[in-house]
């Protein structure tokens, strides 16, 4: 059992550590810009770091759910790879947003694509799971033919 989900667990741990890093950056920015809790406004430099952390936190539960569903029902390796791409894009998003609002955009789009790919893999995996075996075999046969032609 553990071997079947080790990649997913590793990506999950990496994601949690990344979230902790983002939180520590907000704490550091609070000190640097003298913004005491519970305030969430201050200099634009602080607000960008704060917003980047909040935005990343808002999407983290969606990411985790899709990572695990895609990994269990589609393919663990494919889901883990998409998860790593997502986390790297989120790190770049955070770093870009800390510099300027404009610099967050390219990594934001990259992380959105990775997340949508995880959603698609999860949906395909669940669809294949619930399809009758004969229909699933026929669809996979058609897909193989299609892939061999290209």
UniProtKB/Swiss-Prot annotation:
Q: In which pathway does it act?
A: Lipid metabolism; leukotriene C4 biosynthesis
Q: Name one Pfam family in it.
A: MAPEG
Cytoplasmic side residue ranges read 1-6, 70-73, 125-150
Which SUPFAM superfamilies does the protein's record reference?
MAPEG domain-like
Chief place of localization: nucleus
Reading the lineage from the top rank, the first entry is Eukaryota
Instruction: Describe its membrane topology.
Output: Multi-pass membrane protein
GO terms for molecular function, please? enzyme activator activity; glutathione peroxidase activity; glutathione transferase activity; leukotriene-C4 synthase activity
Chain sites annotated for binding glutathione = 30, 51-55, 58-59, 93-97
What's the stated role of this polypeptide?
Catalyzes the conjugation of leukotriene A4 with reduced glutathione (GSH) to form leukotriene C4 with high specificity. Can also catalyze the transfer of a glutathionyl group from glutathione (GSH) to 13(S),14(S)-epoxy-docosahexaenoic acid to form maresin conjugate in tissue regeneration 1 (MCTR1), a bioactive lipid mediator that possess potent anti-inflammatory and proresolving actions.
Instruction: Supply the name of the protein.
Output: Leukotriene C4 synthase
Per the UniProt record, the source organism is Bos taurus
UniProt lineage: Eukaryota, Metazoa, Chordata, Craniata, Vertebrata
């Amino acid at each position: 059992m553990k071997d079947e989900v080790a990649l997913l667990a590793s990506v999950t741990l990496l994601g949690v550590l990344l979230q902790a890093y983002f939180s520590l950056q907000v704490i550091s920015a609070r000190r640097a810009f003298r913004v005491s809790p519970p305030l969430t406004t201050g200099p634009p430099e602080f607000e960008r770091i704060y917003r980047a952390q909040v935005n990343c936190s808002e999407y983290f539960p969606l990411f985790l759910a899709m990572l695990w569903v895609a990994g269990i029902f589609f393919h663990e390796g494919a889901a883990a790879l998409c998860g790593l791409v997502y986390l790297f894009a989120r790190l770049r998003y955070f770093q870009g947003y800390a510099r300027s609002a404009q610099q967050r955009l390219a990594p934001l789009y990259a992380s959105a694509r990775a997340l949508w790919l995880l959603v698609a893999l999860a949906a395909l995996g669940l669809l294949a799971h619930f399809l009758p075996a004969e229909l699933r075999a026929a669809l996979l046969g058609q897909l193989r033919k299609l892939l061999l032609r290209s």
